């Protein structure tokens, strides 16, 4: 089974996920842009049973981050964990987005991801 791991900028928070993700996406919504400080967020979703994290975390509006370095890390509930893929130790990652959200907010200079589903807003 594949194991991917990552950590925050200062190394205080570590995480790992096992197996293939349920889905892999890119989001261009205003919240993701502001939260990441970039034009989009690259993330994947795993079942909560295949996700582990260690170290002290802080939370804002359901999003977990390192209280020391401020790195945005993940969010989770009792079913799933959404991991910010930029924090994985392996770069580039072996993961390819299968969908894009909020493409109506995508920068004009960014091309759609080939073969990925495109959603004007959310998937539902």
Language model features with spans:
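A short Gly-Trp-Pro
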Residues: 1-124
């Amino acid at each position: 089974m594949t194991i991917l791991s990552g950590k925050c900028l200062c190394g205080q928070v570590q995480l790992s996920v096992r197996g293939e993700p349920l889905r892999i996406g890119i989001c261009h919504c205003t919240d993701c842009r502001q939260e990441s400080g970039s034009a989009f967020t690259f993330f994947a979703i795993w079942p909560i049973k295949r996700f582990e994290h260690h170290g002290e975390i802080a939370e804002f509006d359901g999003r977990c981050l390192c209280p020391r370095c401020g790195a945005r890390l993940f969010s989770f509930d009792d079913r799933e964990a959404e991991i910010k893929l930029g924090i994985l130790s392996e770069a580039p990652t072996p993961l390819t987005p299968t969908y894009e959200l909020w493409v109506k907010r995508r920068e004009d200079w960014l091309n759609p991801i080939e073969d990925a589903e495109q959603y004007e807003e959310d998937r539902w």
